[in-house]
């Protein structure tokens, strides 16, 4: 097998910082929201320059639903997506009140 990536190498170079952050969060008891999430959202927005805000969400389904809702999309709107996707994609579309429309990928 040809290796696709080596996340362990990246982890090893930042191991002490990552481990310390994980222990800090676990010790605080704040797994959702909390100071670390707030700091991450601010740093993420700053990193992207023109972004005024960023919002951390629990998963990709919530991210898709919030993006669609922020665009004013909802009931009666159709979202074209690939038929070769995870169920979470469809869940996000339907959570926003939209209807998925499947399209084949044709290279």
Regions found by a protein language model. Give the residues of each.
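Conserved PLP-binding active-site segment in aminotransferase class I/II-type PLP enzymes
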Residues: 1-70, 74-75, 95
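PLP-dependent aminotransferase-like
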Residues: 69-107
């Amino acid at each position: 097998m040809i290796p696709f990536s080596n996340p362990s190498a990246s982890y090893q170079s930042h191991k002490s910082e990552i481990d310390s952050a994980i222990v800090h969060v676990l010790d605080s008891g704040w797994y959702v929201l909390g100071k670390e999430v707030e700091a991450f959202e601010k740093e993420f927005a700053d990193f992207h320059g023109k972004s005024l805000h960023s919002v951390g969400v629990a998963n990709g389904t919530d991210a898709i639903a919030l993006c669609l809702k922020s665009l004013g999309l909802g009931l009666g709107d159709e979202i074209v997506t690939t038929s070769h996707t995870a169920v979470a994609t469809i869940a996000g579309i339907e959570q926003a009140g939209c209807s998925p429309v499947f399209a084949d990928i044709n290279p």
